[in-house]
């Protein structure tokens, strides 16, 4: 209700869920900007099915669903290490790791070189690339965003899009629909505040254009 009131105040047209449920073959394009990962994070399986069915029904037969969202780690099970940028941020990174484990966003790290109240050396972690992906992209939000962001997964794979949209509703396989990878270099200084890295390890956003096959 708060969001709807803000949209009204800014003269922005919108549809309520009830209106969208009664909409059929209406839109040429439905644009999901940083929405897909939130649907995966917060909705139950029945709620996801209901939401994607509703969007598919509202789209014209020749319409397109555009998904712009986080990317993914292409080799999620590979084991590697990463180093915290300095001892001054050891504890902040460690807090994020503990919270992400608690919320089942990441698995327990295989090896953790963490000493409580150690002010001399930056921590070094050995874990999967998937864990590193989630840890790094979450930590840059800062602890003020911990409660909200630590509940969300940022891994948006083609397989996940296929599972929830393409196969159930007859869209082309998502891996063939990857339209663009964005590397926003303004992210790099924020990542380097917490981690010893020289370049962006992954795209900061990916864009899919999903088209119907029937």
Where would I find each of the regions flagged by the language model?
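Conserved acidic residues
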Residues: 28
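Hydrophobic adenine-recognition pocket in adenosine-nucleotide-binding enzymes
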Residues: 35
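A short, conserved alpha-helix within the catalytic core of class I
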Residues: 39-58, 67
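Surface-exposed cleft-lining segments at the edges of enzyme active sites
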Residues: 38-46, 145-152
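Class I (Rossmann-like) S-adenosyl-L-methionine-dependent methyltransferase catalytic domain
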Residues: 1-22, 63-214
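A conserved beta-strand element that flanks and buttresses the S-adenosyl-L-methionine
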Residues: 31
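Structured loop/turn residues at beta-strand edges in well-structured enzyme cores
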Residues: 25
């Amino acid at each position: 209700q708060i969001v709807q009131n803000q949209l009204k105040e800014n003269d922005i047209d919108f549809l309520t869920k009830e209106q969208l449920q009664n909409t059929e073959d209406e839109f040429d394009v439905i644009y999901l900007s940083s929405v897909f990962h939130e649907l995966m994070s917060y909705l139950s399986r029945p709620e996801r099915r209901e939401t994607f069915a509703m969007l598919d029904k509202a789209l014209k037969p020749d319409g397109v669903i555009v998904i712009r969202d986080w990317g993914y780690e292409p080799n999620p099970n590979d084991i590697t290490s990463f180093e915290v940028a300095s001892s001054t941020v050891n504890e902040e990174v460690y807090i994020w790791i503990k919270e992400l484990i608690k919320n089942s966003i990441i698995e327990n790290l295989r090896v953790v070189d963490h000493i409580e109240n150690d002010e001399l050396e930056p921590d070094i972690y050995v874990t999967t690339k998937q864990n590193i992906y989630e840890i790094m992209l979450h930590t840059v939000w800062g602890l003020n965003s911990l409660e909200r962001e630590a509940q969300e997964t940022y891994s948006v794979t083609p397989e996940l899009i296929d599972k929830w949209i393409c196969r159930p509703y007859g869209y082309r396989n998502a891996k063939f629909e990857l339209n663009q990878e964005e590397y926003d270099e303004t992210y790099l200084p924020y990542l380097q505040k917490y981690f010893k890295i020289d370049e962006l390890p992954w795209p900061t956003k990916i864009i899919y254009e999903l088209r119907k096959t029937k």
